[in-house]
């Protein structure tokens, strides 16, 4: 029997340290697609990518999504990547992938080759949004406000003369404490807050385990604010939210443990600051050619009234504690409608 429902390929998992977070996000999206009015419009097809990079069929993928024990006895029917263009039942791709190979432009290029629309930014916006060094270079060219930073590559760590110049830059430009981050990871994975040269050296070595490119940023004592972006030809910004946490900084544990962090939505800000953040969020996305959906993170120093753009996340999380869907719900857009809007925007 002919069906006019659109088939949505929900792709999740992946070769990334954020694999488990991706599964949680995908479960939220998958359930939203099967909710009330969306159920009449869409058919959700989960597609799991395991930690080795193999793609799996719908049955196996659904068993992973809902942690069904019987997935252990399923025959692993892997999908041949050469046949992706022939997956005629997929109308729109919905990536729920985080980190390398998922939100860095790699899979976006693959989706583009199938000729089917996909949710989120294209190859360029995804790549720039993933690499913090490249992203900050673009922000600098657009004169967007950001904290002082320096960057280095993993091979440079062994060069004593080069590292001596880095230490001098830390003292002159950055100062302690500072953050050392892998350039291409999210969810605070691989990050260290260093209060001394010794901690800085340890942080560099730690970050180098995750990435060849490393960024060092000045630590700003201020409020951490976030704003959601939705749209392509016309971008809209959500209300501004604030993240508070019990840890020294917004660690992986505090991001995904409700007992260690809390959110205030909307944030308690005067209207001028709130409007400025919403405007800067759109400007940041346009600068790196990000569209569809994004979450833009900020630092705000009340004493100076200074706003700093931290980063643009082009595939923000969709877990129960994730800010992006929560920000939009507070803006009047419920999860089910948000997911439907993202699919329709992808087809523009």
UniProtKB/Swiss-Prot annotation:
Protein origin, superkingdom: Bacteria
GO cellular component assignments: cytosol
EC code(s) of this entry: 6.3.2.4
Keywords noted in UniProt: ATP-binding, Cell shape, Cell wall biogenesis/degradation, Cytoplasm, Ligase, Magnesium, Manganese, Metal-binding, Nucleotide-binding, Peptidoglycan synthesis
UniProt cofactor note: Binds 2 magnesium or manganese ions per subunit.
Annotated Pfam families: Dala_Dala_lig_C, Dala_Dala_lig_N
UniProt binding sites for Mg(2+) 2: 311, 313
SUPFAM superfamilies found in the cross-reference section: Glutathione synthetase ATP-binding domain-like, PreATP-grasp domain
UniProt-annotated location(s): Cytoplasm
Family the UniProt entry places it in: Belongs to the D-alanine--D-alanine ligase family.
UniProt name for this protein: D-alanine--D-alanine ligase
Lineage per the UniProt record: Bacteria, Bacillati, Cyanobacteriota, Cyanophyceae, Synechococcales
Underlying gene: ddl
